[in-house]
Structure formats: C-alpha cells, structure tokens
C-alpha cells in the first residue's frame, strides 16, 4: 500500500514540474521561431535592396509582366528609372508584402567629385533603401519589444546611362 501512495506522489510531482517548465519551453520555442522569421525578413529586404540597386546601376527597366529583375531592357525614358527600381525591389520582397512605397531611390555624387547626378550620370552612386516593419507572432514578445523597424540600403555606382 505504501508503494502505491509513493507512486501517486511521484506522478503528481512530475505533473507539477511539467506544468511549471512547459510554458517556459513553449515561450523559448516561439522566441526562436520569431528570431528566425526576423532573420528571414532582414535577408529578404537586403536582397531586395541589392536587386533594386543592380537595376539602378545598369539603368535598365524590368520587362517581365511580374516586374521582377530577371528580364530587363534599357530605359528609353529616364523618368521611368525610379519606377523600375522600386518595382524590381518590391517584387523581390513579395513574400513580405512590401509595396513600392517602402522603397526609396536616390542618386548622389561620389565624395570628392563635382559630378552632377540630376539627371543621372555614369559614376553617380545609386542608393536603394528598403524599409520593413517586423511584427513578432509571439504575443508576449510582441508586447515587450513591439514592432521592429528594419531597413537595408545598397549603394552601387551607375555603370551606364541610356539616352
């Protein structure tokens, strides 16, 4: 009889220990999941900024219906350059739902030069910035840190300009 009572006591103890440890383990697991999602989001916006900067560097415009960066042609109308770069970068980050409004494009002169970059000239630096707001899916982590603003900028020299 004493063995049965000891066994029940041990079973109850294990249940209490499990009840105390389980929420911590779940929180840790969800934190790891959110951390992985944050790394994925940052890598995606970094790739999008790079893709947009490459299109800006060669002064090309996307020709595929989806607006991605794989098929390009020279820009006949330079006023389309910003549109093409923004569309390319936003399309590269489709998985995050990034729109063209989250992409900023600017052209600056290299330091120590008198090069004018309005309109764009060869040698100007194309700056493409992609912004994203990351929302953790774990409620307790979301309450502690809130939303996390992410931004990635890619800078490349303009290699060619078409008339």
Segments and roles (model prediction):
Residues 2-89, 93:
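Alpha-helical assembly-interface signal, strongest on the long, hydrophobic N-terminal helix that forms
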Residues 42, 134-137:
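Alpha-helical transmembrane segments of polytopic integral membrane proteins
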Residues 63, 136-163:
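Low-complexity, S/T/G/P-rich flexible repeat/linker segments used as non-globular hinges
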Residues 91-102:
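Short secondary-structure junctions
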Residues 101-121:
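Short amphipathic beta-strand and strand-loop transition segments with alternating hydrophobic
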Residues 104, 125-127, 151:
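Outer-membrane beta-barrel architecture
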Residues 120-126, 144-148:
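A generic structural micro-feature
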Residues 124-134:
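A short hydrophobic beta-strand element
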């Amino acid at each position: 009889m004493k063995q049965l009572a000891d066994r029940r006591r041990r079973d109850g103890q294990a249940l209490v220990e499990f009840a105390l440890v389980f929420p911590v383990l779940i929180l840790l697991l969800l934190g790891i999941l959110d951390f992985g999602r944050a790394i994925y989001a940052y890598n995606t916006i970094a790739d999008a900024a790079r893709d947009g900067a490459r299109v800006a560097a060669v002064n090309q415009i996307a020709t595929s219906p989806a607006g991605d960066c794989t098929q390009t042609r020279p820009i006949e109308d330079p006023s389309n350059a910003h549109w093409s770069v923004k569309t390319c970068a936003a399309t590269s980050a489709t998985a995050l739902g990034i729109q063209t409004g989250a992409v900023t494009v600017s052209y600056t002169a290299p330091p120590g030069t008198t090069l004018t970059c309005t309109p764009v000239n060869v040698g100007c630096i194309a700056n493409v910035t992609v912004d994203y707001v990351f929302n953790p899916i774990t409620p307790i982590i979301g309450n502690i840190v809130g939303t996390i603003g992410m931004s990635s900028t890619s800078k490349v020299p303009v290699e060619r300009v078409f008339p």
